[in-house]
């Protein structure tokens, strides 16, 4: 399929840099999102915070793009069908959203078991085991696509 990467074309040398890009971007999002919530509450201190533990969790977002490419190869192998960019964005957005939910749930479970989980959604209407919030689905959809964009090789 034109434009799709093969396994050998996924540049593993870029993975450490992309891991850092996603880790730092995730940290920034963790600070910005609560800051906007504080503005809505008219708390003009505009506070936001994150945990050092979140860096490797967000860093794993570097794997989303390669996973999306592999899924694209699997869904339409050799069909010659060139998917529209909007269709790919929707497919990838939903895929990344689900993968982020799964990663958040399992990372949270592991951290909670060690008394180190920096988040607890208990008491929120859409939480599952206090580890994920289903109302974050649009945020994870967009975050996955953002990670895909910031880790894409320029010109490719």
PLM features: what roles do these ranges have?
Residues 1-156:
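Aromatic-rich, lipid-facing transmembrane alpha helices and their immediate juxtamembrane interface loops
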């Amino acid at each position: 399929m034109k434009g799709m990467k093969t396994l050998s074309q996924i540049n593993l040398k870029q993975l450490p840099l992309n891991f850092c890009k996603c880790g730092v971007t995730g940290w920034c999002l963790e600070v910005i999102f609560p800051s906007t919530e504080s503005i809505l509450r008219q708390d003009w201190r505009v506070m936001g915070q994150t945990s050092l533990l979140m860096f490797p969790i967000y860093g794993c977002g570097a794997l989303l793009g390669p996973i999306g490419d592999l899924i694209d190869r699997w869904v339409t192998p050799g069909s010659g069908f060139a998917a529209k960019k909007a269709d790919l964005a929707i497919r990838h957005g939903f895929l990344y959203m689900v993968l982020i939910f799964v990663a958040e749930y399992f990372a949270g479970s592991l951290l909670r078991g060690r008394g180190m989980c920096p988040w607890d959604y208990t008491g929120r209407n859409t939480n599952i085991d206090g580890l994920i919030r289903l109302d974050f689905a649009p945020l994870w959809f967009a975050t996955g696509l953002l990670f895909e964009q910031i880790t894409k090789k320029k010109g490719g």
